[in-house]
From Swiss-Prot:
Annotated transmembrane regions: none
Keyword Signal in record: no
Entry GO CC: host cell perinuclear region of cytoplasm; virion component
Protein name: Polyprotein pp62
Induction field: Expressed in the late phase of the viral replicative cycle.
Top-level division of the source organism's lineage: Viruses
Keywords (A to Z) from UniProt: Disulfide bond, Host cytoplasm, Late protein, Ubl conjugation, Virion
Amino acid sequence: MPSNMKQFCKISVWLQQHDPDLLEIINNLCMLGNLSAAKYKHGVTFIYPKQAKIRDEIKKHAYSNDPSQAIKTLESLILPFYIPTPAEFTGEIGSYTGVKLEVEKTEANKVILKNGEAVLVPAADFKPFPDRRLAVWIMESGSMPLEGPPYKRKKEGGGNDPPVPKHISPYTPRTRIAIEVEKAFDDCMRQNWCSVNNPYLAKSVSLLSFLSLNHPTEFIKVLPLIDFDPLVTFYLLLEPYKTHGDDFLIPETILFGPTGWNGTDLYQSAMLEFKKFFTQITRQTFMDIADSATKEVDVPICYSDPETVHSYTNHVRTEILHHNAVNKVTTPNLVVQAYNELEQTNTIRHYGPIFPESTINALRFWKKLWQDEQRFVIHGLHRTLMDQPTYETSEFAEIVRNLRFSRPGNNYINELNITSPAMYGDKHTTGDIAPNDRFAMLVAFINSTDFLYTAIPEEKVGGNETQTSSLTDLVPTRLHSFLNHNLSKLKILNRAQQTVRNILSNDCLNQLKHYVKHTGKNEILKILQE
């Protein structure tokens, strides 16, 4: 009996026959879904690198401490279009990286690209099932471009993307900063995927730098809550669309006014400084603030031993998912119990204190659970946005609308959409998520690092994976984008490369810039620019 397929339902089946090692790498990098035609409206084409040198480079980077280069190279080999013959290699096409492919020459059975000078021929032995829009090409020489002008596919049916909302009432100093950042992000994503400057990263670093320099007790309070995704950090710290209540994480008097932050940019190398904040989680030397009740000094465990915190969190996670009654009634109640213990006693499984007293006081009355569900949802939406082959304003607008109208932070318990037991009651029939899908998302949330979140030092990212329950097999494919992987968040973060020449120390420069911004002392600014 023949052992090889003659027709293929998947590109991965063809790879299994031709290069199982490369298929294993793609699978280990969680990129198999990128080869599925179901992911793309226009089918998918895979460029197989015939050159052993390219495949060896992919392997070397894939199994290194930073697999981002392997991911980027593989993305350059995936085209979100069905291109079966050279005749279809026309118009606005590009790779999954978003880089436009410029064709220099097409022949009867060959395509030569300008950028990268790749020579491509259709794979003679790849024949997809008739209903599958799949194609495989062989790259005989050259390479696929990793950088270059972006491509923009025309939309079918006409019309423009809904714009990112730019107006909201009431219009506060917090919303003003958020709207400015959202507009800047939309603009730079259209230009270069924010590869040069990420506005969310810049503002998050600037706010944290301001707190570190001017309000160290506030800095200590918020540091355990920061997230590797600067977009998430920005919204959780600023809370720009909250209109009810005065329980802001950072008070108005600190953010605004003559001595406030006021949105000032305070950074020299945003990405490096942002990562540095995570290393401070285990290197705090000024945690000598006595507990207000006992008058004793307790160094919060989120600072002194974050690994143990995550170990106890894993115990809670395992207990919930391996409980003898994992269902839509028991499971959400167990999640709420875990958060109630943390909010009321500052412990996880009676181990604590987890957070500084000021932090836990700011997270009571459902705010901690609301924050972590917020992380989970925004991570998923942001990851979906960044995984698209082309940037669409409508996708980003959906994130903004979710933050403004569904999760502004006005009523924490009522804004819980996944974790609230009320969502699974017999009488609860409203909402736009089917009960099984909602429960699958709850299981994914429990399995994510967003569950009972505490910021983890950068050197710990990419460690042991969370133990999962067999229930995760129930998660529909379209919901896998909600799973939170720190490495993918770091990949988004590493798109930003913001550096300037350091003349003075970062702290000194930041203090001077803030002084100039709010006093108009332009002579000092001239000196800094020399």
